[in-house]
Design a protein with these regions (language model features):
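The feature primarily captures lumenal catalytic ectodomains
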Residues: 1-196
């Protein structure tokens, strides 16, 4: 059963109010965190790069993935029209813990290491303020879990299975945090943010 069906404009997550956690570098990159409240996920799929954030709090529809897919020469499928026919599912559960959006490329080892892992800079920064912060993930298309190399990497970084939750469209998340890419965010050609080498 659905509770809402309507067409809404899509906004980039960092076109709304954010908090800057690292100043802009010489290539125009900076690290920001966006906070979104009363969130449910919608979109073509729950798998990267398809999820959209719908905020019950302010009725915004938000694109959390701002990446250029170099092999395709474009961004996500939403970026042609920047609107979507929203179909919000009935809420079956509430997630009270703050969650950090981490639905990025975990299917390809190179992209996971180079593009996806740097998103964790924002996660670890925010975990200082929100010790119970969870990492919100989604498995690759056609899978029901993350690949072992992802879990192994999390373990090396001190992220346990208890720190990770899987995205569910029937869950309402009280607070979702979205962080900047250190290699994308509309700047796929310039060198990555220097923080990536820490």
């Amino acid at each position: 059963m659905n509770i809402r069906k309507t067409t809404l404009p899509i906004k980039y997550w960092n076109d709304l109010e954010t908090r800057i956690i690292s100043p802009e570098d010489e290539n125009g990159r900076k690290v920001e965190i966006g906070y979104f409240f009363g969130v449910q996920f919608t979109g073509h799929s729950i798998h990267y790069p398809q999820p959209l954030i719908y905020s019950h709090y302010d009725n915004n529809l938000i694109l959390p993935t701002k990446e250029m897919f170099m092999s395709l020469g474009r961004g996500t499928v939403y970026e042609d029209k920047m609107e979507y026919d929203v179909n919000i599912e009935k809420t079956e559960s509430i997630q009270d813990d703050f969650v950090y959006y981490f639905v990025y490329n975990t299917a390809n080892y190179f992209h996971f290491i180079y593009d996806t892992l740097p998103y964790l800079y924002g996660y670890f920064n925010e975990k200082k303020y929100f010790p119970n912060l969870k990492l919100l993930v989604s498995p690759p298309e056609g899978k029901n879990d993350l690949y072992p190399f992802v879990w192994d990497t999390f373990e090396l970084l001190g992220i346990t299975r208890d720190d990770v939750i899987f995205l569910d469209t029937k869950t309402r998340y009280n607070t979702v945090l979205v962080g900047s890419s250190l290699t994308h965010d509309g700047l796929s050609d310039p060198p990555p943010l220097s923080l990536i080498h820490i």
